[in-house]
Structures are given as structure tokens and as C-alpha cells.
């Protein structure tokens, strides 16, 4: 069997231009142009995905097999290329019969070339063979190109259907989850799953609910954007230059403070200069000059001068803590049902929006009688988010098991710098000392943070004492009415 890649190589056909033309034509569709004007961030995310599409289309074309008739015709064409003039004319009728049997598009043109050449009445030369093979090559190239177009048209229909589904999903969720180009790109990658409109409509409903609770959205923003600096002490004390200002005698002092012996010619007393003019005392003058015993004025004065010393220095610097992933634990007990359940799910949706924008991971754990896991930023994150939002809160409260699972997750690779967020009303039994010890160990040794989102003012203070920060959002009727009144 002859592959299309081999045929392209032998006929010097480049499929890159055909693929480029197909993609440009597909994206130029009027409905897509209108959509991209409305959501430019999704268009930029799609543009980053185009090289992968082109590579996939190229691989599919290479994997395609040439039809047997076209392959047999091409093999015959290669044989004719290797034949000399005598062999070519001897096998010409067999070649025409083969083209007729294969129903080749070149058959009629080949028959016309043979009839026009009037071979019985003209001498046999190489010009006819060259012309015949050139026209045959053009016909084979056209057939291969048509095959490319047919395959690309099939791929175009499939790609267009997939594109419309993903654009519909991304367009519906873009106002909800996309905050910047990073979020739009990750949302586009997550839209590969096969979801119907009814599947992701629940996401839109909770997004609308979140818009109706601006205080809850603001609380999620404060928690998600919060960070603190780490004090990091260097292990080795390295020698570094240390600059100090010291007071030293001036090079050109100006204040006279007395008389002393020296060799300073400029500050000599007049009697000493007189001895230099007496011939008998001249040698005595030079002797005293060498011995620095000439009487001269004493001048004094101080200046401040910078001196550099080398000393061992140990730094303790404040580094901004990197924003790691979220591990969100949601209480699914009966007391968290109703409005509390809506707020908890909407809060997780707000954290997902922040995680997408900051290129972080968002991991959800539901704790009741058993722990259920969802990673909302995975490749199948939208499908998992739909399943999470469809979960009902009717279990018990097992906060100890949740914290234990959270600590275990935070010790795994890729989760060392994670932030733990516990969403609950914290109406539960006291925590075992072993769990409290594990949480404090993570806080002290790894500087990992544990946040509590309290949905009730009646949570037990003894339980919430272990958290680094407590974010309160009371869902009681009085608090709800007060928040609505303030708006």
C-alpha cells in the first residue's frame, strides 16, 4: 500500500499551504468573526492552539493511504521514467490499456497525445516521451491534490463541529471564569470535553448567583489574592564589603597649633631658612633636613573619609510567598444545605476563577462520611465542576478526616506551597490533638497557610483557633437582610 505522505514526497507536493488555506477559510466564517470580536481573549487562546491543529492535520494526511487504482497508476508512471526510448514506445499500448482499465483521468489526454503525434509516420525521439511523462505527472499531482482536498474537507467538517461546541462553551463561561488571557487560554484548553448546553448551564446559574452576592465574591478575591512574605535566612555567611566613615587628619590642614621638628620645607620657620643662605651652615641644614629636625609650623585639621572593610554578613530577607494551588474542603453536612450550600459552591467557583487567572490549581474535597475529590483545573475540569455543583449536601460532619486528608495532600509533590481553605459552619466536634499537631507542624515547618471560611457566627472557637485566618460570611437571615439593605 502506498501512503499519501510517500506520494507527496515523490511528487514534491507540500500539504502545508493546503492546510493553511483550509484553516484560514474556516476561521473567516462570518459567525466566527462576530464571535471573536465579542470575545477577543478566546481568539488569542485559539491562535495559540493553531500550531497543534496544523500538526494534527498534517499527521492525519500522512497516515492516509492512497487508493489502489491511483497507487497502481503511480507505480506504472515510475516504471516509464526508468525506461529508455525504445522500451517506452514498445510498452506504450500496454500503458494506455492500463490507464483505461484504471479509469484514470489522464487516459483521454494520453490518447490525444498519441493520436496527435502520428507515431507510425514519424521517427521515434525523446521529445514525445518527455512531454507524455510531464503531462502524466501533472495529472498525478492533480489527483493527489484532489485527494488532499477531500480529506481536508472531511477534517474541516469535524473540526468545525468541535470548534463550534468549544466556542459555545467558552463563550458561555468566559464572563464567569475568564479574568485575563491566561484564564481564557486555560478555559479554552478545558473546553475539549463533550458537554451539552444543559450540562454547563449549572455553572452559569451559580455564576449569576455569585454576581448577586458581591460580598461573597469580594471575600473570595481577598482570600485568593492574599499573600505574606517569608523570612528566609541564608545558610552560609559570605564575606561582603562594609563601608564606614572615619575621621582622619587632613592632607592639607589649615590651623596652626605649634612648632615641631620635621622635614616639611613649605612650613619651615624663617630662622631655619636663614641657615640655608650661610655657606658655613649649609651642610648643617641638609643634615638636619635628612634627620627631620628642622623647626617647622605644626598644622592640624580632620576630614571624614570612607573606608571599606570586609566582614562576614548573614542576610535575612523577606521573599514574597508564591501563590500556590488551592485545596478547598467543603462541609457537606445537613446544616450546610440550602443557602449555605449555594454560597459554598459559588465561593468555590470564585476561587476557580482566581486559579485560572493566576495559573494555579484548584482541588476540591467534599467531607462528610466519605471524602470526594474534584480537581477543577484539570483537563476535564469543567466536567468535574458540573459534577461538583450537582452534589447535594446531606452528609455528616467529619472535619478531622478532612484536615487529615488535606495535610496528606499538602505533602505530595506539586502541593508543597498550597493554601488550604475550609468552608464550613464549624458546628462540629472538637479536633483530635494529633490533627492539631499535624496542622501546626505544616504551618511552622513549611509555612503553609490554613484558611477558614465560616458560614455561621456560631462556629466553635476552639476548632477555628488552628487557622491562620478566619474569613466570616454569616448566612443567617439577619445578616442576609443587612447585606441587601447596604446595597
UniProtKB/Swiss-Prot annotation:
Subcellular location: Cytoplasm
InterPro entries (alphabetical): Uncharacterised_CoxE, Uncharacterised_ViaA, VWF_A, vWFA_dom_sf
UniProt keyword annotations, A-Z: Chaperone, Cytoplasm
Keyword Chaperone: yes
Primary location: cytoplasm
SUPFAM superfamilies for the chain: vWA-like (SSF53300)
Pfam family name, one: VWA_CoxE
This protein's GO CC annotations: cytosol
Domain of life: Bacteria
Family: Belongs to the ViaA family.
Chain's role: Component of the RavA-ViaA chaperone complex, which may act on the membrane to optimize the function of some of the respiratory chains. ViaA stimulates the ATPase activity of RavA.
HAMAP family with a match to the protein in the record: ViaA
Quaternary structure, from the entry: Homodimer. Interacts with RavA.
Protein name from the UniProt record: Regulatory protein ViaA
